[in-house]
Amino acid sequence: RRLTGLPWFSAMAVIEGNRLVYESYAADFRADQPHSIMSISKMSANLIIGRLWEEGRIDLGETIGAVLPWIGAGYREATVQDVLNMNVKNGYDEDYSNPDTTAFLHEAASGMRLPTGGEPSNRDFIAAIGLAPGAKDTVNDTGTYLYKSANTDVLAFVAEARGGRALGQWLADLADAAGVEGALHVATDRQGFPLLNGGICLTARDLCRYGAVLGRLGLGVDGRPFGSDPFLRATLAGGISMPPPRGHLRYSNQTNTNGVWLGHGGYGGQYLITNPKTGRTAAFLSVLQDTSGYDPSYYPPIIAMLAEICAGG
């Protein structure tokens, strides 16, 4: 009640299997109203890359440069697996308290923020990312993950290069696999390329249905695989340590995990958790109203609440 009573709360929903267990909405928000899920969108990359890996079209150990010859030094020698795990050190930074952070320049290139000068394409921006100052390679020597939304766009370009079809077709199939009640909305860059790094918008109920695809270990509502069961099991078991206040979690294949559940947060106050063992999925949507739109201390209580709900009992 404390979290759903916050002034920036939008919506919360919980499902178990195909049953709606709980939902709550702010006075100015409706059950049929889509909400930006921001970086929870990244979980779609797990499903798509996992399917391509299981089909033998992607080797997680190959370098990004082997798949995308046009990529720059910031990703050329990084492996697909390291990009999935946010285990790449390069010249891209994502510090929301810094108005000049690379992430905001990335938003301008992808059409999510008004540019101050020219209008570079998202692909050109990604291609121009170089090594970190003074670095000779992209090896992450920090001991924890290095969060970069550009990583997800790189994976999206990899998926389109190896998938043999437009990325938008994958998202149409994802909407079907989730069995969305409304629609799966996704922002695109100026060239029409979907933004998996943070462009999806869903209702609270449909966000749970989206998460449940991962909770079913890749199966759609019709029982057909959209993601990959072995890839998601490896996701639960693997990953790179996250720093405090999420030190008990790992970043694994475009998800957060503690080995029991899979989840992800979104800029501005969103979080999603799905528990494959209990079949429960819970989503929390809000819009933080502070200077940067981000507060690391805001998420732990939400994560703890959703994890407890999804544990059942």
Predicted features and spans:
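Active-site SXXK
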Residues: 18, 35-60, 83, 155-159, ...
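Active-site helix/loop module of the DD-peptidase/beta-lactamase fold
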Residues: 54-96, 161-198, 202
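Solvent-exposed loop and edge beta-strand segments that line ligand/cofactor-binding
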Residues: 138-147, 195-201, 264, 270
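Active-site-proximal alpha-helical segments within enzyme catalytic domains
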Residues: 150-158, 198-219, 270-287
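Active-site Gly/Thr loop motif
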Residues: 181-185, 232-284, 289
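Short, gly/Ser/Thr-rich active-site loops of penicillin-recognizing serine hydrolases
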Residues: 294-313
